[in-house]
């Protein structure tokens, strides 16, 4: 499976097993995001990747507010309703929440069956990522910001993720 960075109106399909697409600049918009996702599904895409809590401006992990959690859940719920079971939801958070916030987010998103929760906490916080992974049914994904075999070895030893996404150019 390949995930490609995408501009707002990315329209070509890529990938072998699934055809992922990033929803673009409709992060956190519970009305626009589902329409965009449905548009891509109608074009034959079978997965959409998006961050329902963007934009956050903090540089270090933080607790998500109740309103941010509610909006994220509404975004994911509306996208799931728009695409049904024809499309996988790939949830990315850019490692913005702290572990407690990521766990609260995951609990709210579980009913919508996302394929993964990518970088629920900063990837260098392996212990906290493992804590999140143990606390949710959603598979945790990470790896594109890890650069050495030692970082991956720690990730594996702590069972911090079930989907590994190495950036092979690193």
Regions found by a protein language model. Name each.
Residues 49, 67-68, 90-94, 113-123, ...:
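Catalytic beta/alpha-barrel core
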Residues 44, 107-115, 131-140, 156-164:
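Glycine-enriched alpha-helix->loop->beta-strand junction motifs that scaffold or abut catalytic
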Residues 1-90, 96, 103, 107-111:
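N-terminal capping/lid subdomain adjacent to the active-site entrance of alpha/beta enzymes
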Residues 11, 128-131, 154:
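A short acidic, amphipathic alpha-helical/loop segment
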Residues 48, 79, 92, 117, ...:
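Conserved, mostly hydrophobic/aromatic
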Residues 34, 126, 148-149:
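Structural motif corresponding to alpha-helix initiation and N-cap regions
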Residues 97-109, 147-159:
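Catalytic cores of alpha/beta
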